Amino acid sequence: MILVRSNPQFSNNIINFNFKNYEKIHFVDLENIVGRKPFRSKNYFEKMFYEFDKYCQNHVDFEKDFVFVAANYFIINQLRLRYESQPDNLCLIPINGKDGADKLLVKSINIFIENDMFFQHNYVYIASGDGMFTPPLNALGEIGIQTKVVALFNKINRSIYSATQKITYRNFNELQDYKLDNITVFLMDYISKSLDYDFALKQVVSQKLITVEKLNLDSKLKTHYIVEIRKTKNNKLSSKNVINRLNKIPALVKKLYKLNINVTIKSKSTKDIYL
């Protein structure tokens, strides 16, 4: 385990890292994947450890990957105690302040890009849906580095969808409990964001605010999804801006999940929308 402090020597301290022997390079905003504001309590620490362990189980191979974690000082102190025996491919970065972790991770990625430190075999994972990662995601794509965003449902900035090459949802419990695949969750997520829904995935699924049905058609045809929206605010489905956003769905699914799809969106408030 390595501890790198956010001081004037920060850039010099990280510029000597070498990613040649690593496959995935993870940039984890721990507070973002927890989904709650940091708080000094036993419950918060248990939640934080659970979410980070779950992230690592699903996405990290510590024999092949390098992991950067940025968070509030008191959170990093807890991680130091738990992972002190971890080899030097886990880098902890303590930083206080609003959006401090995101800003420092973005700074780190930019430093690595500017100094040509990524290799073509590296795969960059960003565990945050914050929009400030959009410029580095675009920059990574321009130099041929694969990227994936791992984030919470309805917590992904709209600009991220077009910037990253893949999106995976970090709602591990709901994905398992409701047997949801990433494309189904993406459709619910993207439509929720387009309609300004402020709901968690569990609410959307349990209350059937948005339902998604996958039709098993002939394998030579595009996969067809039927999306039903229970209700919308202020007839948003009739808005040109919303329609323009929804029209991007097939292209985004092809980019993010390598699947050609057609979508029919149904709602009592408007005519069917065919994408």
Q: What are the roles of these predicted feature ranges?
A:
Residues 2-101, 141-142, 146, 151:
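Domain-level signal for Mg2+-assisted phosphodiester chemistry and nucleotide/NA-binding surfaces
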Residues 74-203, 207-208, 216, 236, ...:
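Nuclease catalytic cores that cleave nucleic-acid phosphodiester bonds
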Residues 30-32, 203-207, 215-232:
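Short glycine-rich, basic-tinged beta-strand/loop micro-motifs
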